[in-house]
Amino acid sequence: MAAIAVTAIDASHSAAAQGRLDAEYDATVAGIPIGHGSWVVEIFDNSFTASASGTTEGLMKFFTGARGTGASRGTMTAGQLVPTSYAATIIDDRHIDEVHISLAGGNVTDYTAEPALLPLPERIPVTDADRRGVVDPMTSALTRVGGSGDPVSPEACQRKVPVFDGRVRYDLGSEFKRMESVKAEKGYEGPVVVCALYFTPISGYVPDRAAIKYLVELRDAEVWLAPIAGTRVLAPFYFSMPTPLGLGVLKAKQFVSAAQPAHAIAKTQ
């Protein structure tokens, strides 16, 4: 009887729409392959998880055999994704870069970043206030659209996301540009909403750095958002940004998402 009761409780808690995304991406610069990666996102009624991995390839692998992993998890609170932990590791032939962030209610409670930023006098310091009301970089890539209409809509682009990546605090702003239709080699075929992206550094950066100035002045970066089935969450299908070497593109070759109905989850308990 206890097992039946637990199953019934779990089923009732899982009644809201839920879904899973399995995506694979190819990265290119000026049309030249430089890397590939995978991303798995699971959206539950009260929580979410996301994990990613990637590696360089082609000409880029000749210069650096970099590979990386990342993971984020959190809660669904008031219809929004609120992260509780984030971890990322990037390893190349010479270095290991690691970031760990713990959060509660949108506020950073603990974090480590190795190697640490150089304590340059011109660097704008990150304050305690800068680490409040933020999300991690992976969570920032997911967009939850409120309401009851089609989530693949201009509304998905109307947002400004405060991000802390363990070293730098910045805002990611977006605006609606247009609607498009896409077809993955495997998985999703249908409409996407195209958003212009804007980068605004807040702290942890050196204002005179050329890379920072380039990102601040950039006006041609865009992301194409596609739906995760069974949810009101959208994820990137395509991302493009001009670089000094040519157009940088991250494009999904696989974008397979499926709703996970409550009765299916109850059956597995």
Feature-to-residue mapping (PLM):
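Long, charge-rich C-terminal accessory regions
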Residues: P137, A141, G147-G149
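Internal, conserved structured core segments that host functional sites
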Residues: I91, H95-T139
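C-terminal segment of classical bacterial N-terminal signal peptides
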Residues: I4-S14
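Acidic, serine/threonine-rich low-complexity disordered tracts
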Residues: A15-G105, G149-Q269
